[in-house]
Structures are given as structure tokens and as C-alpha cells.
Regions:
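Alpha-helical bundle regulatory/interaction domains
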Residues: 2-17, 24-30, 34-37, 88-194
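Well-ordered mid-protein domain cores that form the structural environment of catalytic cofactors
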Residues: 57-58, 64-111
Length: 194
């Protein structure tokens, strides 16, 4: 396992694991209580995490197919996306998740996901009160019914800015983690995302 966190800031973390048990322990703070490797071979996993208060980013990667179960925070609304060139590389609650889907935002549903080999899973958690306040200010009517669908399939052009944003965050995690520890950069990221 390696850790890149030169300033000791607990709000930004980047770790690599070559052991599933250590990876499983590291994702427990994400309320994932079970993580099982489904494909044979050596395990390599990466966790990148940044907590900016009302906004949290998590990037998970593993070189093997895995299944995760757990519970979600009742205080946050989460949005997840998978990054992989193939159309379908994840299953959540028994339903295929495509590369043009946002999923996992119903806080009343537990975590139940299977991801294939070499899939990048990027999650954003927004404080529920802040999320609904911003949604209302922006004129969005996100009813309980919409949120309980737990997945939205979006047109690729509609999703392009969010995918690009997630790719940039993931790139910064992997190449310049120390930038995420700077308050000015955190403010810029929060403004851009929200």
C-alpha cells in the first residue's frame, strides 16, 4: 500500500492497495461493509478521496471485478458514474449501469454494486440540505419520485461537461494531489461543480 498525502491533510487522501483486505478496510468510512473480488488474479486498487465540507469526491479503481455492499449516508445525496470504454461495466441493484448513467443518489437505498475489471467509479456526495437549496435556487424540481429512481440515463452531450469535470478531478487526484489541499483550489472546485 502506498499513500500520497505530503501535508498530512485528512481531507484529501490518495492510496493504492495490492491487497483486497486492506482495500476493504480503507473503504469502510464510505459505509461499504462488504467487498468481494469476483475474478481470479492479483488485486490492485486505488482510492482517492477529498472532503470539502458540503462536497465530497471519491474515485475508486480496481483491476479485478468486485462486488460491494453497504449503506449510504442519510445526510448526503450521492451521484456516481463509471468510466470505461464499454457501454455496460457495472450493475447496481440488479440493473445494468451504462457509461451515460448517473446512479446511486437515493439515500434510502443501500449500496449494492458489481463492477467489472478496470472500471473507474467516481462518486460525488453533496450535503442534502445544500443540494436541495441549490436545486431550488436553480429552478429544478427534484421530487422524491425522481430521486427514488436511483438512476438517470442522460444523452451523451448532456453528460459531457460532468464527465469532463470528473475526468479532471480524477487526473488531479492521480497527478497533483497536493493541489486539492489548497483552500483556493477547493473553493474553485466547489463553485465549478455546484
Amino acid at each position: 500500500m502506498s499513500e500520497h498525502n505530503p501535508h498530512g491533510n485528512p481531507l484529501v487522501l490518495s492510496r493504492q492497495f495490492n491487497d483486497l483486505d486492506r482495500f476493504r478496510e480503507a473503504i469502510k468510512p464510505l459505509n461499504v461493509t462488504e467487498c468481494t473480488q469476483l475474478s481470479p488474479g492479483g488485486f490492485l486498487g486505488t482510492i482517492n478521496f477529498a472532503d470539502f465540507g458540503n462536497l465530497k469526491f471519491t474515485h475508486l479503481y480496481q483491476n479485478q471485478a468486485t462486488k460491494g455492499n453497504g449503506r449510504k449516508s442519510i445526510d448526503d445525496i450521492a451521484f456516481s458514474m463509471v468510466f470505461h470504454p464499454n457501454l455496460i461495466q457495472a450493475i447496481s441493484h440488479g440493473c445494468a449501469v451504462g457509461k451515460y448513467d448517473l446512479f446511486g443518489f437515493d439515500p434510502t437505498r443501500e449500496v449494492d454494486i458489481v463492477v467489472d475489471k478496470d472500471v473507474h467509479l467516481v462518486m460525488t456526495s453533496v450535503n442534502k440540505c445544500a443540494f436541495y437549496t441549490l436545486s431550488e435556487q436553480m429552478g429544478y424540481n427534484l421530487t422524491v419520485k425522481v430521486m427514488q429512481n436511483n438512476a438517470l440515463s442522460l444523452h451523451p452531450t448532456s453528460l459531457r461537461p460532468l464527465r469532463a469535470f470528473y475526468e479532471e478531478i480524477t487526473h488531479v487526484f492521480n497527478t497533483q494531489t497536493s493541489l486539492l489541499m489548497q483552500l483556493q483550489m477547493q473553493s474553485l472546485i466547489m463553485e465549478d461543480f455546484l
